[in-house]
Regions:
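Beta-strand-turn-beta hairpins that frame and shape the catalytic cleft
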Residues: 1-6, 135-138
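Active-site-proximal beta-strand elements of phosphoester/diester hydrolases
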Residues: 3-15, 100, 113-116
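Active-site beta-strand/loop signature of hydrolases that rely on acidic residues for catalysis
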Residues: 6, 20, 28-57, 78, ...
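N-terminal phosphate-binding loop and adjacent alpha-helix
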Residues: 10-27
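Catalytic metal-binding/acid-base residues of hydrolase active sites
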Residues: 12, 45, 90-91
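A short acidic, glycine-rich active-site loop
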Residues: 58-72, 129
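Active-site catalytic loop in hydrolytic enzyme cores
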Residues: 63, 76, 92-138
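A structural motif corresponding to the C-terminal end of an alpha-helix
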Residues: 70-88
């Protein structure tokens, strides 16, 4: 049986998408240089966690799979480093919003997506305000 090394990355996110992508890029490269072949980044790492309050302006953060900055950036990185990168992003599909993960293969192609099914709803987690339960199964 072949062994596969993976890495889980934790990072503090800022309000700047560009800063967060740059920080994540640096950490992905470090993990890959240490032999990781599957590298997991934090959920919705493109910006600070915004789901703690209800704010209609935050709907503007959502992007399609094809237009998301992190997905497009890390497709190139995955191909360059030959690693698999599950990338979490705030997806807008027509007029429906999802908490989605795109799984990017080691050649830079998107293997598929998973839309989060179980959306928490609590005083500090207003995710049901932002996300529709996913339709991609388990």
């Amino acid at each position: 049986m072949r062994k596969v090394k993976y890495a889980g990355i934790q990072m503090q996110c800022t309000k700047s998408v560009e800063e967060n992508i740059a920080k994540a890029d640096k950490m992905v490269r470090k993990a890959a240089s240490e032999g990781a072949k599957i590298i997991l980044l934090p959920e919705l790492f493109e910006r600070q966690y915004f789901c703690q309050e209800r704010n209609y302006d935050y709907y503007l953060y959502a992007r399609s799979l094809e237009d998301d900055e992190a997905v497009n950036h890390f497709k190139k990185v995955a191909a360059e480093l030959e690693v698999v990168l599950p990338i979490s992003f705030y997806e807008k599909d027509v007029n429906v919003f999802y908490n989605t993960t795109a799984v990017i293969d080691a050649d830079g192609s998107v293997l598929g997506i998973y839309r989060k099914t179980h959306i928490p709803d609590d005083h500090y987690y207003q995710e049901k305000f932002y996300f529709t339960p996913g339709d991609t199964g388990f």
